[in-house]
Amino acid sequence: MAGHSNSMALFSFSLLWLCSGVLGTDTEERLVEHLLDPSRYNKLIRPATNGSELVTVQLMVSLAQLISVHEREQIMTTNVWLTQEWEDYRLTWKPEDFDNMKKVRLPSKHIWLPDVVLYNNADGMYEVSFYSNAVVSYDGSIFWLPPAIYKSACKIEVKHFPFDQQNCTMKFRSWTYDRTEIDLVLKSDVASLDDFTPSGEWDIIALPGRRNENPDDSTYVDITYDFIIRRKPLFYTINLIIPCVLITSLAILVFYLPSDCGEKMTLCISVLLALTVFLLLISKIVPPTSLDVPLVGKYLMFTMVLVTFSIVTSVCVLNVHHRSPTTHTMAPWVKVVFLEKLPTLLFLQQPRHRCARQRLRLRRRQREREGAGALFFREGPAADPCTCFVNPASVQGLAGAFRAEPTAAGPGRSVGPCSCGLREAVDGVRFIADHMRSEDDDQSVREDWKYVAMVIDRLFLWIFVFVCVFGTVGMFLQPLFQNYTATTFLHPDHSAPSSK
């Protein structure tokens, strides 16, 4: 008996719930038919009691996602929710007549909508992407939140790329109604970020909104939002800037590379070609504008100028390196400046302090001076044309070649006639000795020219290092001192836009 009672109670509750659902559905259906009755409602008519009454539309943008910013095409793609609120006196009812129902959702295409569009659209899609339902309250207030994917025109400032900050505006205005019929009001001073999905390329700095009027045209009004965004430079730093800096450092090594290896010009040209490739990559990213040059483009041009300068200096250094006494004479000031003064300033050890070849050459010349007279000819009108002074100790193995006689030329020396064959041999030895001394002197001059080239290389090495370091730091620190604020990007013409 108790089970039968429980079953009856459950059946009664289910029946009551179904009846209430049917009644609720019937109530909402009656309300929708009442509101959208063609005899009392026309969606083509502006909701105003007379022609002079204004319809106030409150507008607010909620940013859901910053999809992309195409620098070359200068287009910003965003996913936004465009909140619009207004009142329609024709869509009112008494809640007590409809089971205290105070809100109802109506298809937006069946009611009057303010034709608010994005004025600075860049792809022809001026309206929203999806016409969602509108929430209508019993007092006639309407809340409409359609989502939209907009592609708006955005003037890209490339001056500090890739450490740049952009201001992309979105201007909303009624397409057919002017200010005498629809008054656009800014619901919030900033766009909402409650449902924003962070971007991997841009940081949102500020999203201020403002209502613009034109003093010269009383019928003009629009709502403008400034999307102030800053680029995240990590991607371009890793893939563009650091490789450029490393390639530039290779250009520094050109001055440290010995001139004898013959690869100076090859390295310079290779670095120049690599920088040219990076410059071509940048030209495909930034917009083709002549108003500003991007920061990374300036840096590449700076390094290309330095590399070109290194090519010119390398040519000059190679020219100096391969000079010889037969083609050039070293001026005294060159010896003073490049062989005595600059090596000390550039932390180079002077070659005469460390060159073993120079020390050996000096010792050999000293021995030649000490051994002079071991075998020499005496010439003059009183001398026999085939007479020579002889050191007996040095010609013990030449017995019979001549007859020595004591002479006053010095102790241990004698004089006597010698054969013509011996004289030819002595002349040959003298020629060889003179030739070797001449070659040794020429080699000394060539080594001096090589050392001058090395000093010039080291001088330009330090100059190149300082210019590269200070130039790089000066260029890339410049954007860090820029004070970006919301007012920085507000253009003067925003306070008085032209009439459309």
Curated annotation (Swiss-Prot):
Site (Key residue for a rapid dissociation (K(off)) from the conotoxin BuIA): 135, 143
InterPro entries assigned: Neur_chan_lig-bd, Neur_chan_lig-bd_sf, Neur_channel, Neuro-gated_channel_TM_sf, Neuro_actylchol_rec, Neurotrans-gated_channel_TM, Neurotransmitter_ion_chnl_CS, Nicotinic_acetylcholine_rcpt
Membrane-side (Extracellular) residue stretches: 25-237, 288-299
Disulphide bridges, residue numbers: 154-168
Record Pfam families: Neur_chan_LBD, Neur_chan_memb
Primary location recorded for the protein, binned into one broad class: membrane
Tissue expression remark: Expressed in most regions of the CNS.
GO biological process, alphabetically ordered: acetylcholine receptor signaling pathway; action potential; associative learning; B cell activation; B cell proliferation; behavioral response to nicotine; calcium ion transport; central nervous system neuron axonogenesis
Keyword flag RNA-binding: no
Intracellular or extracellular location(s): Synaptic cell membrane; Cell membrane
Membrane protein topology class: Multi-pass membrane protein
Effect of residue 118 to Q: 40-fold, 165-fold, and 300-fold decrease in inhibition of alpha-3-beta-2(L118Q) nAChR by alpha-conotoxins PnIA, GID and MII, respectively
Gene Ontology annotations for the cellular component aspect, listed alphabetically: acetylcholine-gated channel complex; cation channel complex; cholinergic synapse; dopaminergic synapse; external side of plasma membrane; neuron projection; neurotransmitter receptor complex; plasma membrane
Family, as annotated: Belongs to the ligand-gated ion channel (TC 1.A.9) family. Acetylcholine receptor (TC 1.A.9.1) subfamily. Beta-2/CHRNB2 sub-subfamily.
Quaternary structure (record): Neuronal AChR is a heteropentamer composed of two different types of subunits: alpha and beta. CHRNB2/Beta-2 subunit can be combined to CHRNA2/alpha-2, CHRNA3/alpha-3 or CHRNA4/alpha-4, CHRNA5/alpha-5, CHRNA6/alpha-6 and CHRNB3/beta-3 to give rise to functional receptors. CHRNA2:CHRNB2 and CHRNA4:CHRNB2 nAChR complexes exist in two subtypes: LS (low agonist sensitivity) with a (CHRNA2/4)3:(CHRNB2)2 and HS (high agonist sensitivity) with a (CHRNA2/4)2:(CHRNB2)3 stoichiometry; the subtypes differ in their subunit binding interfaces which are involved in ligand binding.
NCBIfam families, per the entry: LIC
Annotated protein name in UniProt: Neuronal acetylcholine receptor subunit beta-2
Organism: Rattus norvegicus (Rat)
Lineage: Eukaryota, Metazoa, Chordata, Craniata, Vertebrata
